[in-house]
Design a protein with these regions (language model features):
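Catalytic active-site module of serine/aspartate enzymes centered on a nucleophile-bearing elbow/loop
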Residues: 271-302
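Conserved acidic catalytic loop of the alpha/beta-hydrolase fold
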Residues: 91-99, 103-121
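Short glycine-enriched nucleophile-adjacent loop
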Residues: 130-141, 147
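Short beta-strand/loop motif that positions the catalytic acidic residue
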Residues: 241, 247-249, 253
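Alpha/beta-hydrolase
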Residues: 162-236, 263
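Flexible "cap/lid" loop of the alpha/beta hydrolase fold
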Residues: 138, 146-176
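Conserved alpha/beta-hydrolase "acid-adjacent" motif
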Residues: 254-260
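Conserved HGGG/HGGXW glycine-rich cap/lid loop of the alpha/beta-hydrolase fold
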Residues: 14, 18-92
Length: 302
């Protein structure tokens, strides 16, 4: 049963030169646990039921909007990158230009911890958020108590590419109409899901509607994607990481193959690996997998 936990109202912090929207759940005196979203995810993407269960395990949960989404600072003055030439540059191994970098986003997260007077925290990042969490651990190891990397890669070449039908869905601009946005979210969830966990379409529609109403920003998502495309592999840095690390991945991930998770676990000294059978590239959309992830994080952060 989900226990009732303390919850902050919507708040903003000045971090790394921008405004970051955040909230917290749980005992303010408990061990801090920072949640970092993937591409386009807002803080509410971390479902409150999931966060409440984590908080009930004895954590102060901190969730936030990455730059350019939700209620955090937008970078509209940077324009909207054209993804076609960026994709061509990436395929040719050329340097990809982006309005900002994943390192900037890692610095945002560290700045948020500074603003909250949190000297160190457990960090959990999903997908792009996993890459951001890697950079936090590489650049600020003394600030990271433990690292949990979920559905992420190191940006290392040579792995099977995403399935074309999945990539085409993700490269589509997010609709600016509410109903179209909800339907697009459902299409994405179907493309990213795994065989082991059936989709709850009503659950996904409700979450998508809330996300649209709160702060959908298609241009910001495109800029985030450009930052992700521009990011170099961090494998060499992770080889010498001394932060306790847990790698979680789905066996059926159609976007980032499970081999990427195995590679991360083999790269970070002492890293633990949890492969969830039947899970795709989705976590918050499938409440049936939450307990496995929460149990694993709780064991890892003891």
């Amino acid at each position: 049963m989900t226990q009732k936990v303390r919850h902050t109202d919507r708040a903003f912090a000045y971090a790394n030169g921008i405004e970051i929207a955040y909230d917290t759940l749980g005992d303010p005196a408990a061990d801090p646990l920072l949640l970092i979203n993937g591409l386009g995810g807002q803080l509410i993407t971390w479902h409150e039921g999931f966060c409440a269960e984590l908080a009930a395990r004895g954590y102060r949960i901190i969730r936030f909007d990455n730059r350019d989404v939700g209620l955090s600072t937008k970078f509209d003055q940077a324009g909207v990158p054209d993804l076609s030439p960026l994709t061509a540059d990436q395929e040719r191994g050329k340097e990809v230009e982006a309005p900002y970098t994943l390192r900037d986003m890692a610095d945002d997260a560290i700045g948020l911890l500074d603003a909250l007077n949190v000297s160190s925290a457990h960090v959990v990042g999903t997908s792009m958020g996993g890459r951001i969490a890697h950079l936090m651990a590489i650049c600020y190891p003394h600030r990271i108590r433990t690292l949990t990397s979920v559905m992420a890669s190191m940006g290392e070449p040579g792995f099977p590419p995403p399935k074309p039908e999945v990539l085409s869905v993700l490269m589509e601009p997010a609709p600016t109409n509410r109903q179209a946005y909800i339907e697009s979210s459902l299409v994405s969830a179907r493309a990213l899901g795994g065989r082991g966990f059936p989709l709850d379409e009503a659950f996904i529609r409700e979450a998508a509607g809330k996300a649209f109403d709160r702060g959908s920003n298609p241009d910001g998502i495109t800029r985030q994607l450009a930052a992700l495309m521009a990011a170099a592999s961090n494998k060499s840095e992770l080889k010498s990481l001394r932060v306790p690390s847990l790698i979680i991945h789905g066996s059926d991930d159609p976007l980032i193959p499970v081999e990427c998770a195995i590679d991360i676990a083999n790269t970070i000294p002492g890293a633990q690996l949890l492969i969830i059978e039947g899970m795709g590239h989705s976590l918050m959309d499938i409440p049936g997998v939450w307990s496995q992830v929460i149990d694993a994080v709780a064991r890892h952060t003891i």
